[in-house]
């Protein structure tokens, strides 16, 4: 099997795994009697794990272990943990196992990116073509857990633990396949200490003003973006969309198209404009949700347009962000830098977004009694998210001033490395 095919299959299974359990989880936990707060904390597991993931995939992988071997170990461990999590019926039993599972999975996002980056000749041209298979994997998981069982005459498996068991099996599969991936050895031999272990050596990249603005805006954007992941399925179901789990894969279908078109957009418009367009389309998506419902054809169409824009927004911001980080980070810090963005976005940003969204829904947007069949003021919630993103877009447009021909790796000399490792005071 050619290297590109191996990397593409890796991405397919990597994102199939996450999509299989993450989208339908709300339905299963709700049916199992978990409270809204417990469900919120369950979703926050991935964010908590992302905060710690640089320990596993940042500086350790950069210095000591081949990336594909680390991937195999994490996937095998995750398969066992998810299998046992699927057997639980109480929050006390489920939450620790899901958190432990998330600690094995979240590091692999940056890890698979790094494996792909290290084994393609032209990152800006080739990475989107490989990463698009991850989107197809997410779609496949939605179809497998949404439409497919019903098409075959079986009951809907979304509100059951079967998606979690599918996740466990898929994790074991990728664990085996990881041994057939191209060898991606460590690229640095620097001294190892606690600062390096935590990935803090990559923080030196924040001295670059444009990278700092990018990092800060990515952190802020992750908060309102989290509202979509935790609330969209419940919202779409409550306003009348049948089989929302399956229909939400439309966002990934649009992601495929724009992923393949991404090299054209980045070359034609530049990285800054593409990142900005990702923010703008995210705000518009929430705008469509404000007015969407299943009552009329027009308002029903707004729901589907909102779902489709999710793929556009994700591609234009986050996939472009991975490319930008790879361009800015020195070669020996690239895995740590990808882990730093994971820490920023899927970690602290998402965690705060899940908690902020939960508090806002409970304190400000929950109806005492159902209003027109709705238990929450969804329009108010989506308005709040849209305004947040609009403000972030304005900040990014004003303060990020780096043009494409100015994007080069941040220079890190021996003294900088010594400072990050505590050798110079």
Swiss-Prot record:
TM region positions: 9-29, 39-59, 64-84, 91-111, 132-152, 162-182, 211-231, 245-265, 288-308, 340-360, 380-400
UniProt-annotated location(s): Cell inner membrane
Record GO cellular component, one term: plasma membrane
Species per Swiss-Prot/TrEMBL record: Escherichia coli (strain K12)
UniProt entry tagged with the keyword Transmembrane helix: yes
Family designation: Belongs to the major facilitator superfamily. Nucleoside:H(+) symporter (NHS) (TC 2.A.1.10) family.
Function: Could be involved in nucleoside transport.
InterPro entries from the UniProt entry: MFS_dom, MFS_trans_sf, Nuc_H_symport
PROSITE patterns: MFS
CDD domains: MFS_NHS
MF (Gene Ontology): cytidine transmembrane transporter activity; uridine transmembrane transporter activity
Entry keywords, A to Z: Cell inner membrane, Cell membrane, Membrane, Transmembrane, Transmembrane helix, Transport
Membrane topology term: Multi-pass membrane protein
Protein known as: Putative nucleoside transporter YegT
Ranges in a coiled coil: none
Positions in the Periplasmic compartment: 1-8, 60-63, 112-131, 183-210, 266-287, 361-379
Domain of life: Bacteria
Side Cytoplasmic, residues: 30-38, 85-90, 153-161, 232-244, 309-339, 401-425
């Amino acid at each position: 099997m050619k290297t590109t095919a191996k990397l593409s299959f890796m991405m397919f299974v990597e994102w199939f795994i996450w999509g299989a359990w993450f989208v339908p989880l709300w339905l299963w936990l709700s049916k199992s009697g978990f409270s809204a707060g417990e469900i919120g904390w369950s979703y926050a597991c991935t964010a908590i794990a992302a905060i710690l993931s640089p320990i596993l995939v940042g500086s350790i992988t950069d210095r000591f272990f081949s990336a594909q071997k680390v991937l195999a170990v994490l996937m095998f461990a995750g398969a066992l943990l998810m299998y046992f999590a699927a057997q639980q019926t109480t929050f006390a039993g489920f939450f620790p196992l899901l958190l432990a599972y998330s600690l094995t999975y979240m590091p692999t996002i940056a890890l698979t990116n790094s494996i792909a980056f290290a084994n393609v000749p032209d990152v800006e041209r080739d990475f989107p073509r490989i990463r698009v298979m991850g989107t197809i994997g997410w779609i496949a998981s939605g179809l497998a857990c949404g439409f497919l069982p019903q098409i075959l005459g079986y009951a809907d498996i979304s509100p059951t633990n079967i998606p979690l068991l599918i996740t466990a099996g898929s994790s074991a599969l990728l664990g085996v396949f990881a041994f057939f991936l191209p060898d991606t050895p460590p690229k640095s031999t620097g001294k190892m200490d606690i600062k390096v272990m935590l990935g803090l050596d990559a923080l030196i990249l924040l001295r670059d003003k444009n990278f700092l603005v990018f990092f800060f805006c990515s952190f802020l954007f992750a908060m309102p973006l989290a509202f979509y992941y935790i609330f969209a399925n419940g919202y779409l179901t409550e306003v009348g969309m049948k089989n929302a789990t399956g229909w939400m894969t439309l966002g990934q279908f649009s992601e495929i198209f724009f992923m393949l078109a991404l090299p054209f957009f980045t070359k034609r418009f530049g990285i800054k404009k593409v990142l900005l367009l990702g923010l703008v389309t995210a705000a518009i998506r929430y705008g469509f949700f404000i007015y969407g419902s299943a009552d009329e054809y027009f308002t029903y169409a707004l729901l589907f347009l909102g779902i489709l824009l999710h793929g556009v927004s994700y591609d234009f911001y986050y996939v472009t962000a991975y490319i930008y980080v790879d361009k800015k980070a020195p070669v020996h810090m690239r895995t740590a830098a990808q882990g730093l963005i994971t820490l920023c976005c899927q970690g602290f940003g998402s965690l705060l977004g899940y908690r902020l969204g939960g508090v806002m829904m409970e304190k400000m947007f929950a109806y005492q009694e159902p209003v027109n069949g709705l238990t929450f003021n969804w329009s108010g919630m989506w308005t709040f998210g849209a305004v947040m993103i609009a403000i972030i877009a304005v900040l990014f447009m004003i303060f990020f001033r780096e043009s494409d021909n100015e994007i080069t790796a941040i220079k890190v000399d021996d003294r900088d490395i010594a400072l990050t490792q505590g050798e110079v005071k």
